Amino acid sequence: YKSILSDGQSSWLDGSGNKIPMFGTPSLVDSDISWQQIETLDFGIDLRFFNNKFGVTFDWFQRDTKNMIIPGESLPVTLGAAAPSGNYGSLRTKGWELSADFNHRFANGLGINITASISDASTFITKGADYLTPWEDRSLGTTYSTGRRYGDIYGFVTDRLFQKEDFVYGADGQIEKIIVIYNGTARTTYKQSSEYPVYQVHYEDGNKLIFSPGDTKFVDLDGDGYITPGTSTNGNPGDQTVIGNTTPRYEYSFRLGADYKGFDFSIYFQGIGKRKIWGNGQLAIPGYNAKEGALPKTFTTDYWTEERTNAFYPRAWDLGGSNTGFAMQKQSRYLLDMSYLRIKNITLGYTVPTNILSKIYISKARVYMSLENFFTFDNLRGLPIDPEAISGYSMFSTNYNLGRTGTGTPVFKSLSCGVQLTF
């Protein structure tokens, strides 16, 4: 956390035609920055039954992170620099973990062992950089906003896609236009057929950008007849509400193992019960950047047309490299459901009897085959996104995959076979 100067080359040339080196304004640093403190309270119970064959463990914890280093509250742009980070944040996380295990060997020699666990936790910001700001004026876009649950996603609740029958048509077969008054300004939009129309003119320009059949229709939560983001504050969220949370919830795992007369088998499951994100990039957002030409098959086969009115995705549109815009505002319908169940490993092995090995001076030999990450069950509607690795990264900071959902290195599937020998 030292104040540094960013270096680079200006657009000015010296007498030899070379670009002149330059240094940027030094970053601001809080002179009183210090270590953050973590306090943890934990209660646990560990029980064993049936001659130690069955066990249950339960833990409940509360973790307080105090004086956490987070960005300061936004300062006027006339300052000329970003607000410095400092010890402005405090979090409280509450969670629990339950695990159980069982092992037994039957009289016929069959042995089984089972382990399972599930855990959950949620975090609330007890103090953010905006703690002095009145509650009603705190921005919905602030990650560490005082009193808010960490990871909450604010957006619109999607009703459905507009259909042709939602609009009024003239004698020429074209949708009729009308003038509505929005925030004291006359706005041109398409006339709706509903007795109680809800207009979305906040995101229209009255010309090319007008909500039409195939575009997303949002729910008017505040009942004023318009879809708006308000001031995007706690006190005036408009029609925005919490539509999801990025924190993984209900993380679970399950392992089953068995062995019998030299054969052994194990299978390991892992998953997350609940998690939502608003994606970024061509794999997550339909129409993200049409000029790139790269998009999943799911988008090309399930977008709205007059012949496919029950499609999941809206009519084709080019967002010009943005993950929000026009009909593709942050909304419940197109949040990515990152819950999943993955079979992480399946192993089958056979241990050769020792009476056979003794003849060739080997004390133990085992052959095995193992499958890694071969089977995944998710709710991503066929999108090629790994729910365990969601963010892309580019070493060149290019616009192709920097921060884009699903474009990072995926979890690889692998099949391996081997022989383990002990002499």
Please place each PLM-identified region on the residue numbering.
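Extracytoplasmic gating/loop element in the C-terminal half of outer-membrane beta-barrel translocons
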Residues: 209-211, 235, 272-366, 371-372
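Conserved small-residue
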Residues: 1, 9-10, 103-242, 305, ...
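Small-side-chain secondary-structure face that scaffolds active or pore-lining regions
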Residues: 56, 60-94, 111, 218-220, ...
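C-terminal extracellular loops and terminal segments
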Residues: 83-92, 134-150, 237, 243-253, ...
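Extracellular/surface-associated beta-sandwich interaction domains
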Residues: 33, 96, 137, 155-156, ...
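Extracellular/periplasmic, surface-exposed regions of secreted and cell-surface proteins
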Residues: 1-153, 330-423
